[in-house]
Amino acid sequence: MSEYNFTQIEQQAQEYWRENNSFKAVEDKNKEKFYCLSMLPYPSGTLHMGHVRNYTIGDVIARYQKMQGKNVLHPMGWDAFGLPAENAAIKHKKSPYEWTKSNIAYMRSQLDSLGFSFDWSREVATCDESYYKWEQWFFIQLYKKGLAYRKNSVVNWDPVDQTVLANEQVVDGRGWRSGALIEKKEIPQWFLKITDYADELLKDINQLDGWPEAVKTMQTNWIGKSKGLTVKFKIQNSDKEIEVFTTRPDTLMGVSYLGIAPEHPLALEEAKTNSQLKSFIDECKRISTMEADLATQEKKGFKTSIQAIHPISGETVNVWVANFVLMGYGSGAVMSVPAHDQRDWEFAQKYNIALKQVIKPSDNKSKLDLDKEAFTEKGILINSGEFDGLNFKSAYQAIKKYLFDNDKGYETTNFRIHDWGISRQRYWGCPIPMIHCNDCGLVPEKEENLPVKLPTNVTLTEAGSPLKDIPEFLNVACPNCGKPATRETDTFDTFFESSWYYARYTCPTADKMLSEEANYWLPVDKYIGGIEHAIMHLLYARFFHKLMRDQGLVTSDEPFKNLLTQGMVLKDGAKMSKSKGNTVDPQELIDKYGADTVRLFSMFAAPPEQSLEWSDTGVDGANKFLRKVYNYAYTNKEILAKNITIDVTKLSKNDKKARYEIYANLKQAIFDFDKSQFNTVVSACMKILNTLNNYDNLSDSVKLEGFSILLRILSPFTPHICHYLWQEIGLGEDILHTQFPTVDDIALEKDEFLLVVQINGKVKVKLELDASLTKEQVEQEVLSDEQIKTFIKDKQIVKVIYVPQKLINIVVK
């Protein structure tokens, strides 16, 4: 073909890969393995440009590693459960299963049209029984170990949708979808004991050398380990007490009040006889409990009749119900020191609560104005009785000893992270394999009865899950006693499925959760996904991996060796979204320019970690470059088809210069490949093509060598055109299984070099000189040059500064 027909070229290449199972991975202990994985998508129905960029990054890495001779695993699957499928099913009057499977089929064809090197023989969809059977089995093992449990928990309850909402789904006190006023409701929920692994999850962050520092910091903060004291405040005229955790026991003598959560048992008890307090608690139930919102929303409180006794001074301390205290954190109570905590200060200002300063600056110079703000730094204790004059460290130890000796406190290590709530009151999810028996209590399903299948013959409505209304699902015999019992109707949070899919790819058809292949492939060598998953998904996957390790299923401690967090795709400076009307349909681009152009632009426009700004001219530019590559191959077809090798003894001056530039760019490309700086690798390809086009009278052998190197560097980015041209020229059948080029150090040895000549720091001329010249010979050549003689004339040379093979500066006066 004389013209670049991308449609024909891409169809031919994809057909070849299909017929030859080019991407199928097979365990081979004689080869170094490389497991490359992009985060699996939710099957929404169509690909967007974010998908294209994410999977192109992964494909470039996978193809490059394969050309390095490694045994590459590059799988793909579908995160197929979740509420969006229910919503779509209701809207389109289809079952979630039908809707999901239809979307998967279409999106798979879109991925194939982009030439991604996925091993589809390992495809998993989390809604398939063959997948979720094993997470049900695993849950039962965790339940038997006491790592999975059920307890009552306060949740955001949507009375219209009849389901629990995450904090993020509550907007201005209303359900994000139904618009109903949200209620705080206590219902039974299932949890995994991630807190049992909090220390290890925190410690092992230090092992993650291949992760971005930003992600590691986010996980460290989310786990939130803090060491402090738990202090006991006795309730006056009662045998009850309130326990509070503090990391600042040095401020204990400055406590002005205690704050308790609206759901605290003491608050609920008093509300029985106090209608105003009950109204306040009801109001608190309608506000967001997200930490970000708690930090900014108005601080509100209600003074109770309860009084506590200070554990050291013996003074009485008022107890307030406060909207910023969460029952789910610590004991649901805090000690408030308005003089030394800004949040407590704001609350005290609003309700005219007295401040007591107990810390002064260490330098004795800083002036404090507690009428304006709290003094929150550590310093020296004052107004603290026997503890006066102590610094933070000494005060911590002294107060700890006092509390311990008098049974009024103890040292505690607290974590910000709390056990993972894994149950959802929705239909489209993996059934939790537990049974409720009146006689036996909670009983796991027998393993031989797994999977507990999700019924597909359901009628979905907008209100809650239909599982409780399906008798054949709900009613079962107790596995223990055989008496009538009922199934659990909650389903797993979809994070449960996405926390172990990477491991199932290693043995997708195994008749057990994981087989020995898992330890060949794991850990994942390169994991690619958005930084928005830094905490939830990536932390849960790390937790799950440790659970699987302790079950004897894997031997490694961590799931992902290296993590690449790609930036967003922007248009007009904003993230692409349908609501903004700034989306670009990848399919339209593929139809207009071809998959290789779309792939090339997405890699060239910005480094992977940075956001990519969409540019129509950038896409045109990528397409023009590929046409130049094709035209060079077509124009030089007969030359490139020759089976010739380089004879370095017969190279012309231009040949040597061209080879130097080609190999210098190859060397840079290899360095940038290993750093995942793909935009500069593409730039190196463009420079190599320019070199081949710009030098006159290049020998056929140099043209062939240079173009062969170009195609191999470019192949991971634009596999279709490179596959086609590799075959057309006769270089081989399959470029994917060709060795990536290596640097010829001899080619990088210059016969000549370009010397910049300066006089008094100003550039005057540039001279080409023999690379073998010594410093003295270089000076001699420069000073004998006619142009230089003209510039110097009769001036006196003070000194000569020489930077070898780069620059010479002649200082004259």
UniProtKB/Swiss-Prot annotation:
One of its GO terms (biological process) is leucyl-tRNA aminoacylation. ATP binds at residue 578. Gene3D superfamilies: 3.10.20.590, HUPs, Isoleucyl-tRNA Synthetase, Domain 1, Valyl/Leucyl/Isoleucyl-tRNA synthetase, editing domain. Its EC number is 6.1.1.4. A motif ('HIGH' region) lies at residues 41-51. Pfam families: Anticodon_1, tRNA-synt_1, tRNA-synt_1_2, tRNA-synt_1g. It is an enzyme of class 6 (ligase). One of its GO terms (cellular component) is cytosol. It catalyses: tRNA(Leu) + L-leucine + ATP = L-leucyl-tRNA(Leu) + AMP + diphosphate. Signal peptide: none annotated. A motif ('KMSKS' region) lies at residues 575-579. It is found in: Cytoplasm. Belongs to the class-I aminoacyl-tRNA synthetase family. This is Leucine--tRNA ligase.
